[in-house]
Amino acid sequence: MKHLVIRNLGPLKEADIELKRINVIIGPQSSGKSCVLKTACYCTWVEKRIELTQTADFFAKGNNFLNELERFHKLKGYIKDDTFISYESDYMMFSYDNATKTFLFNWKNDRWKYRRSKVTYIPAERNLVAAIPNWFEVKFADDNIRDFMADWETARQSTTHNLPVLNLGVLYHYDANTKSDKVQTADGVTLDFTNTSSGLQSLIPMFVHLNYLSVVQVGKSDNSSVTGNKEKIDLTKLVYDYFSPLFGEKVIEDIGGKRSSVVLEINGEAYSMQRSDIKKMDDIISQYIVTDHCDIFLEEPEANLFPPTQSSVVEWLLAMTTGEQYNNLFVATHSPYILNSFLEKKNIPMTLLYTRMSEGQMVIRTATEEDIQGIYDFGVDAFFNIESLG
């Protein structure tokens, strides 16, 4: 389980939350939902970068930690003099206090049990890829929208077959010859993606992207590029440098003859190691190279969708999250249909968060089991009676 604390960021006075496999946050517009979603996404990415490089030096330097958050997630004007963020998982703990310009970091005992994830932020503006036919020719800032567009480009080019979109009777595919997106509607008519309904223009980018991640990318190693190969080389050196002195026995002199062990030279020192220990190190490297799961941060999955379709989206998200291949999901929503569809599912590891005004400032609260049961059993409308929660 992850623990996230945010103080004095944008409209938020405080958020102190435990994150589970599935997390849903509700609240009025401009109340801090996206601040929480973006910060949780950012901290998950920071954790990944620290694990893959085995150092927090970049984020500890100057104001890099907050600068990267502000740049990537478009939070200019949200950072305050006393902004504070802390994050803790099974692998590490880090925090940044803007009042003292202090970044603190500690490894946890499970440091080397980390498994690589694909961290993805799906913005509410995802329909831009349909609304702007030549979006790939437009220069965008290097932020979460541009990052999603890059991921969309990879996903669409990999979807050259007809992909059924939920249970809508709609098929999507990418035409490599014309470099365009095609959608076959329920009545058999094929349209350019830019000419489809607003609902499909919001749904298809999310659906195709997440389908690609869950079906294609999970289980793949990131060594197909120069960057990926360099990362693997660097990680191999980091792991061998760290574990060889722990697993191996330093060789003082070469006694000759046959050995049951293998001698490795690490940083000018020779270590005699069992093959089983070498396998342990190679397994750790594999955990860092091969994508194990996805950490999905999703804004407004309900955008422009009819209520029954919203429920179908939740069914699909849950199947992808709690099925044979687990993923982590964090959703920000304004829709009671999205919320109720999540709450209908019993025995899933879910946290429901909501924003609330306290002493003139916004705070984040976690709904109690009683709150959740009341919403589900008695039809309490959490969106109109949010002040009754907690």
Residue ranges and their predicted role:
Residues D81, D110-K113, L318-Q325, Y337-G390:
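RecA-like P-loop NTPase motor core
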Residues S312-L317:
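Conserved hydrophobic alpha-helix in the ABC-type ATPase nucleotide-binding domain
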Residues E299-P301:
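Walker B catalytic acidic pair
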Residues F306-P307:
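Conserved D-loop-proximal element of ABC-family nucleotide-binding domains
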Residues A332-H334:
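H-loop/switch region of ABC-family ATPase nucleotide-binding domains
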Residues E18, A40, T44-I296, E344, ...:
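Phosphate-coordinating catalytic segments in nucleotide- and nucleic-acid-processing enzymes
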Residues H293, Q325-F330:
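Loop/turn-to-beta-strand initiation segments
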Residues M1-Y42:
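Pre-Walker A-like glycine/lysine-rich segment at the N-terminus of P-loop NTPase domains
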